[in-house]
Amino acid sequence: MERHRARALGRDSKSSRRKGLQSAPPAGPYEPGEKRPKLHLNIRTLTDDMLDKFASIRIPGSKKERPPLPHLKTVSGISDSSSLSSETMENNPKALPESEVLKLFEKMMEDMNLNEDKKAPLREKDFGIKKEMVMQYINTASKTGSLRSSRQISPQEFLHELKMGYTDERLFTYLESLRVSLTSHPVSWVQSFGHEGLGLLLDILEKLINGQIQEKVVKKTQHKVIQCLRALMNTQYGLERIMSDKRSLSLLAKAMDPRQPAMMADVVKLLSAVCIVGEESILEEVLEALTSAGEERKIDRFFSIVEGLRHNSVNLQVACMQLINALVTSPDDLDFRLHLRNEFMRCGLKEILPNLKGIKNDGLDIQLKVFDEHKEEDLSEFFHRLEDIRAELDEASDVYSMLWDTVKETRAEGHFLSILQHLLLIRNDRFIREQYFKLIDECVSQIVLHRDGTDPDFTYRKRLDLDLSQFVDVCIDQAKLDEWEEKASEHCKKFEKECTDHQETQAQLQKREAKINELQAELQAFKSQFGALPPGTKIPLQPSVEGEAGPSALPPAPPALSGGVPPPPPPPPPPPPPLPGMPMPFGGPVPPPPPLGFLGGQSSIPLNLPFGLKPKKEFKPEISMRRLNWLKIGPNEMSENCFWIKVNENKYENRDLLCKLENTFCCQEKEKRNTNDFDEKKVIKKRMKELKFLDPKIAQNLSIFLSSFRVPYEKIRTMILEVDETQLSESMIQNLIKHLPDEEQLKSLSQFRSDYNSLCEPEQFAVVMSNVKRLRPRLSAILFKLQFEEQVNNIKPDIMAVSTACEEIKKSKGFSKLLELVLLMGNYMNAGSRNAQTFGFDLSSLCKLKDTKSADQKTTLLHFLVDVCEEKHADILHFVDDLAHLDKASRVSVEMLEKNVKQMGRQLQQLEKNLETFPPPEDLHDKFVIKMSSFVISANEQYEKLSTLLGSMTQLYQSIMGYYAVDMKKVSVEEFFNDLNNFRTSFMLALKENIKKREAAEKEKRARIAKERAEKERLERQQEKKRLLEMKTEGDETGVMDSLLEALQSGAAFRDRRKRTPKLKDIRQSLSPMSQRPVLKVCNHENQKMQLTEGSRPHHSINCNSTRTPVAKELNYNLDTHASTGRIKAVEKEACNAESNKKKEMELLGSVAKSESVPEVEALLARLRAL
């Protein structure tokens, strides 16, 4: 009781002193020319106690009065404050030491809530200016009486009362008084309390939450603790302290209770502010706190937030939507944002959204609009990412590598392996496999890409909704496709047969025309020698063999024929005689030893070049270039109809092309040639050891043969006699020819016919087969008959491929243009060398284009050529399609074709001779002569066609090789086609590599741009969060939470990822509290520009007599901390019309001070903040 009585007496004495202080007349403002009285301060007493007093200076009347705080202990420092103040007023402050002035100056700047950016220019000022500022600050504070009233309740007193552990109405009263103190006192007071007070507040909140007491006073107290935390977070210091304490976030998450809408609205707003200001780690801590609270209550972590949306309180609904937007828009990772949004949808947000959109509330409409816009932007970004994946990952190996990197060493690795293993079990049928994969693709797409934007919940019906209608339609279409493919295959075979018949007909026509020409030549020769026969003369017919040999015996015939009939080789042209002396002059002055030592040799070249050839242009590149090592073809190696006679490569000459060629294939860097020693591989022929066919060995081979067929010996003999192709196989005849004994052994074995039963099986078989006369020739003929059709079918396509390829090469315009372009580039690159001014080159040199590297070793001449064709000569690229049969022709050996056809002809001749000398059949089953005679007739017809086709093919490849001046003595047909096919393959590969290179460059460019954009967004996000914390134009550290909540309410706190990041001016206009007031919408727009311009200007000097308009300070709309509305509107009106001129600022300040009785300390604070 005594203790409470002492406290009551202390309160009475305090109240009496407070009344006495308030009754004293306030110091009025002085006129500009009037001398101010000196301050009487005791310099020695201005120690740390005085620094504490500066920390507690506040503006009277600008904050709400605090309710009386009961049961507080009296503090001895209270009685000392008045005496100390009176003592300091009596002394001269000018005698204050420099160190004390600097301490007071630092304490003054801290009490003014200046950050380090604002403190730095002030610290650089002259000591006299600092001292004058301190004196003015002390003088103003002492006159207003704030020094005498600032020590009424200290932070230590609040800490002491919080430690008492009250849980009744007294605690509620303490917390209400604490909330007002945290709101009204400066930052230094808040820092002094928050160092230990934050932990005490969290302890109280934890005790109230875990107490499970549903009394009304407990819930009111819990709400009051939340309000105290909000007041503490209204400063930058308090916000940083709470964000750094994990327990605070956990307790705030546990305090969310939809049954208390007012308290939950405050809690949700605080968490929203933390989310938009904090880094990714803070967001993770908030989510972790929500998860822990949900697990403790055994509910989903977002259940309380969604339940808050179901409440009838619109304020709570707006706050919950703010938190949802803060959580969903804060992460940088798209997948994480989609995951959080989908989780909210599953918790019931999807069903609530239509109801929320029906509520008419501006704040709620803003939050719903932010949610919808960010949802659409994320979905659009997600679809674009899928399109990029489809466009870039077109290789199955790249997709597999990405998937494997995603799942390896995770729990999903086993499932991924199981999926692959199941895919291997699909039936190995090309049609069925495709349908399986389509069905699997449909299932996977429905699982991972749900149409409504939410994760599919398969636990509801335990099944997957799969639309098989499209799959059935595909199966029907596939059946139709199979039918059409079968018909197309039949037509293709018919077309190939028609082409073959056409070529055969053409070949026969050419052969007969040649025969006609030959006969006409013989007739003309005969007439010229013997003259015309008289009419009616009969000439006896001679054998054809003698008639054919007649013309060759006539010496004069060839000269006579040269004028009438063109021979296969053209006659030597007249120009060749002077050509032996022309090889050196042909090159002009290019070779080191100039030919014949004359300067005018170049002008005489056109007179001696054959077939109207003109000398090639001599190029002189500005820098030395890499050489194209091609094989040069001279004019004397060309024929009149040669391709190189007609080329005109100058039409492709382009200065841009030549400059690009120079830059790419210059020789500024020495080319490092790696000399690789190629050792010739010695072909080691395996020498087959000669086998000695002894009787035991022959018997063993026959035993193996007979055991594999299991056919009676007599039946085998009958099959051979009858030439039964239905039962005789090629392998069977080959084995018989290989393993049968020779004729002498067969004859000797025939003597043991009487002892047949006593012989072993091989000998019995040999005895049976000894009765067949001329067994080996018979077997060889049967084998030839069995193989003939197959040989014809193998030879015909090869002849067709070579013939078609020759025609394609000659007809391809793209290939001709390509050769002209290569000739131009090669002559330019070889300028100044022995290969310069070339009329043509060997086609085998095309394969060497890929061996010519660029100066930077990053590309080749072939890739450069492909690039030029793609850019300017796209029609050249079609030559790849024009030479469709070149690949097959390159695999054909013309030499082997000719050998096979000749071998076939020899076998037919041998068969005809054997049939002529074959003995008459003695056995009724012997049908060899009959069947073989008919076979020989049909085979001869086939052979004649093959011979004709082969001759036509020979003429075609000889013509095409002569057309391109290819020396057939040095280059075979196989090499010619192989070189062209290798070049064609290399060209297609270079084309693909160029495309991949461009795609890789584009991909790298997109990745670089994306990385730069992400880095830019990260920096902008940091700046934005920094601006959210420093919302005031003058850097005030108070009102942080008010500004954040204002930004949340207006939607400006949620950054737009797809639009441009707003500038600092736009952000301040959108986040400033005065921009939300419609009454100031017009004037603030212009005033903000003025403030930013002034605020961004560096201050190199300070005028102590000038003041700045405290725009940001007076335009803070906090009803608990500001004066009357009329005065605020007056200050706002004056602020909107303020000028940057010093004179108008002074007039404005004077008018405000006179009309609204603004204390002088406010003008001083505004002046100091402006400095």
Swiss-Prot record:
PTM-bearing positions, type Phosphoserine: S56, S154, S604, S1072, S1157
Coiled coil: 373-403, 478-533, 887-918, 988-1038
Species, as recorded: Mus musculus (Mouse)
GO molecular function: actin binding; cytoskeletal protein binding; microtubule binding; protein homodimerization activity; small GTPase binding
Annotated FH2 domain residues: 615-1013
Keywords tagged on the record: Coiled coil, Cytoplasm, Nucleus, Phosphoprotein, Repeat, Ubl conjugation
Biased composition (Low complexity): 76-86
Domain GBD/FH3: 93-455
GO cellular component entries: actin filament bundle; cleavage furrow; cytoplasm; ESCRT I complex; filamentous actin; microtubule organizing center; nucleus; ribbon synapse
Modified-residue entries (Phosphothreonine), positions: T47
SUPFAM superfamilies found in the cross-reference section: ARM repeat (SSF48371), Formin homology 2 domain (FH2 domain) (SSF101447)
Region (Disordered): 1-40, 60-95, 532-601
Motif Nuclear export signal, residue numbers: 1162-1171
InterPro entries: ARM-like (IPR011989), ARM-type_fold (IPR016024), DAD_dom (IPR014767), DIA_GBD_sf (IPR044933), Drf_DAD (IPR010465), FH2_Formin (IPR015425), FH2_Formin_sf (IPR042201), FH3_dom (IPR010472)
A Pfam match: Drf_GBD
GO biological process, one term: in utero embryonic development
Sequence ranges assigned to domain FH1 in this UniProt record: 540-610
Name this protein carries in UniProt: Protein diaphanous homolog 3
Effect of K493R: No loss of ubiquitination
Motif Nuclear localization signal per UniProt: ranges: 16-39
Known function: Actin nucleation and elongation factor required for the assembly of F-actin structures, such as actin cables and stress fibers. Required for cytokinesis, stress fiber formation and transcriptional activation of the serum response factor. Binds to GTP-bound form of Rho and to profilin: acts in a Rho-dependent manner to recruit profilin to the membrane, where it promotes actin polymerization. DFR proteins couple Rho and Src tyrosine kinase during signaling and the regulation of actin dynamics.
Gene, per the UniProt record: Diaph3
Regions of compositional bias (Basic and acidic residues) in chain numbering: 1-15
